[in-house]
């Protein structure tokens, strides 16, 4: 098996890069998907709302939190009980799939990497940092945006806005 872990600030282009990697035969997974499914059940809202930037900013839960704040709160509360809780759920989904090449579009903490390494000990793992041109801080005030700074990534993709040819060339050298 082969795993590509993508990390970068919100808006850096992680999903854009992941989608291009999918076009090369990979299957895309997000560690946040089980969180979004859980929140969808808890709030009785469509799971799609948990991925919609406008809904995450405008929808207010009964306790006054935005949907984004609520998703982060649920994720952190469960991580306090088990730091690998969401990664374990994602790893289980992968175990029951036939996919042999996986790209993670939202890698944010080391527990996710460690869980995948333990679950798939013989897998090849590639860790990639995506940097958007001119983006030095995250537009989202969340500590997980910064948790992998200083990690020794094997590759860095420079996402220069609008230069898809250069972006594709970098991706092909990794996947």
PLM regions: where:
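Extreme N-terminal starter segment of soluble prokaryotic enzymes
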Residues: 1-4
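Small-molecule kinase domains that catalyze NTP-dependent phosphoryl transfer to phosphate-bearing small molecules
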Residues: 7-8, 65, 85, 89-90, ...
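Walker A (P-loop) phosphate-binding loop of P-loop NTPases
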Residues: 11
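Conserved lysine of the Walker
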Residues: 14
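Hydrophobic positions on the alpha1 helix immediately C-terminal to the Walker A/P-loop
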Residues: 17
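Post-Walker A helix-loop "phosphate-sensing" segment adjacent to the P-loop in P-loop NTPases
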Residues: 23-29
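ATP-dependent NMP and nucleoside kinases share a basic, alpha-helical "lid"
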Residues: 27, 89-144
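ATP-dependent small-molecule kinase phosphotransfer cores
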Residues: 33-101
């Amino acid at each position: 098996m082969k795993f590509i872990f993508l990390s970068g600030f919100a808006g850096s282009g992680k999903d854009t890069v992941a989608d291009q990697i999918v076009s090369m035969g990979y299957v895309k997974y997000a560690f946040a998907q089980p969180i979004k499914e859980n929140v969808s059940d808890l709030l009785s809202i469509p799971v799609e709302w948990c991925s919609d930037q406008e809904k995450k900013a405008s929808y207010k839960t009964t306790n006054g939190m935005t949907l984004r704040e609520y998703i982060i709160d649920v994720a952190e509360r469960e991580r306090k009980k088990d730091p690998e809780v969401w990664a374990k759920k994602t790893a289980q989904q992968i175990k029951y799939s036939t996919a042999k090449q996986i790209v993670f579009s939202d890698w944010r903490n080391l527990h996710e990497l460690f869980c995948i390494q333990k679950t798939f000990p013989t897998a090849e793992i590639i860790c990639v940092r995506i940097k958007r041109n001119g983006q030095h801080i995250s537009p989202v005030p969340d500590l997980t945006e910064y948790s992998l700074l200083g990690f020794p990534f094997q590759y860095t993709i420079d996402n220069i806005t609008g230069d898809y040819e250069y972006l594709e060339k970098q991706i092909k050298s990794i996947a």
